[in-house]
Amino acid sequence: VDGFLPPELIYSNPGFLRPCRGLPVAGQVLLHLYGADLVRSGGGQWRCFADRTQSASGAGYAHENRKVVSRVLPDEIREASVRSPSPFFRALRSILESLAPQGREHPLMVLLTPGPLHATYFEHAYLARHLGIPLVEGADLTVRDLRVCLKTLEGLQPVDVVLRRVDDSFCDPLELRAESVLGVPGLVQAARAGHVTVANALGSGLLESPAFLAFLPAVCRHLLDEDLKLPSVPTWWCGEAEGLRYVTAHLERLVVKPAFGRRRGRIWFGHQLSAADKTRLLELIAARPQEFVGQECVMPSSAPVWTSAGFERRSVLLRAYVATNGTNPVVLPGGLARVAASEDDPWVSMQGGAGSKDTWVLRSGDDDGEESLAAAPAQGPTDRRLTGLPSRAADSLFWLGRYAERLEQHLRVLRCVLGQLASDSSPETSDRDDRLGHLVAGIGLLPVTPEPSVAPPADGEPGPPETADDVPDLTRKVLDWVYRFDGPGSIPDLMGRIRQNAAAVRDRLSGDTWQVLDRLVPQGEVPQARRSIAHALGLVQGLILNLAAFNGLAMENMTRGPGWRFLDCGRRLERGFSMTSLMTAAAFVPGAPTPLLEVILDIADSGMTHRQRYFASARWPGVVEVLVRDVSNPRALAFQLSALRNHLEALQDEFRVGVDDRWSALIEGIQGRLLSAEFAPEVPDREGFDRQTLIALMETCAQGLAGLSDDLTHRYFSHTHPRVS
């Protein structure tokens, strides 16, 4: 800037991205969302100590804080006339719409996130949902003919505006950091061609260096002929001789920080350094002075925080936000107030456990017009174009449905077994435990060993499943499975898979749905003294009810679009697998069938249906009719096939591609076999039922469902990574 900035400050900064130099800028605005980290000194003066120009995270947290506080203190907020943050976000959406190249009438905007593992992913999903734009990862986007496109089930859709939450150097592995897996190959080239606008502009991370604060007052006076309205914390860059001399001479009064890069985690407070640490720091500065800055140590003001010990003082910082398209800047009323994790913490770090507070700005007489102007959207909601479902989101919804149904099935089996074990002991207890042990081992829930007493199957016949070893000790095994087992297929494992897939589509799930999913977390270590059948039953029952709430919200609140269909396809496939496994395991259990069949009906929540229909004890023909053939029973295998067929036909009509005719024929064939199968044995016996026919039929159904799952994956989720089934 006319010689006010040393060249070394620019060219030695890793944030200077040479490929981004000269990129076209919509409206000549590089920063569309800006954040300023502010500190209030003991004298009450506010100063800026850091600029956030990459992505200015935290605005979504501020909005969420207001939502929470509004529910807790609604009267206080209304009586105090606190300004709402909502107009800021409506203005932000309007600003993003105005950035579309060539003034497109219905621009497609996306929020680019590093993914669910990022520390601020919650805010990414929250902000995308609140702005009404798709939340995407780098793998969801591709560049075709210099156009950034969103991969959807309908095909590639051109993207006009990218609101990024990925650091600029990671946004394009072709021209920036080659090792990045977070960005979009070709994004810089598409931006250079003027076909997409990235907000904030690629390369804007350069300005996050605290070294610029040392020169900002002079630059402001040169460009605007005025002093900074909001002064910065006095800063000295050690890359200049004068700054280096001042920092080394006044180290005990300063805070020393890295000047460049992502090494902000290490901060040295001069007054806390020992003599040895001070010497070591001076050696580091002397070796590479351009990589360090010194800032005046301004101790933040404090705010009261309620803890288990009562009210405590905590240091507080404020991040303020501005959104602009170059003409009408809009300031977020309030901002994100952050409080230190402990009373003696000299600074505030969210990574170090700091908390946040809602910040109130009171309304004045001339605020209404400003908020109305900011709230006015560029287009009416009826004019906004619908965005297709990204393939990755469809994949995550599909597996969310599968894992949720798998967990529910496991829990239903455990609940039934625990209920049986909790019943009064009798001479038949040993036989009961033996049947239950064979059943749960056949399903695959318990550690198993081959049962030596079972004769090998004849040629062409299916072999028996493995059975639980040490069946008389069934109670101990079931309790161990509930409390201790955390391997594949366990309760904690399935909970983790559910939350992982739900997190990938967090912007597509309602707040009520997330409240239910938040309860699906492992309970932690349960003391041995508390482990009992009664306690395990309560734990399992609570999880079943939470899953029922999740399923109910999905059925009642989700629009019947492709997302819901893939979620329900996953549920129907998994329920079909579970039913074939349950019926096969039951068919292999020796002994009198009636008690076991009643257990199966209980697991499938179909005991009442059977009693109302047959008015008799459970027998194989009636159970097969209820759990296999009944197209009106939501737990029956035939119902799952019918639902899958309806979903596949709807998807085929919507996308004009879809399932081969062979899969439609397969479903029809399985349905026909289910309805026409004859289970009368060739040689009359006491049961009057041919179990081998049922076992073969269930095996055929399971193979067909597996092939159908693979075909869905290949056709709709081909660009995603394969999942472990």
What are these regions (language model features)?
Residues 1-28, 41-43, 53-109, 117-124, ...:
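Alpha-helical transmembrane segments and their helix-helix packing motifs
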Residues 1-354, 358-374, 380, 391:
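Domain-scale recognition of functional cores that engage charged ligands
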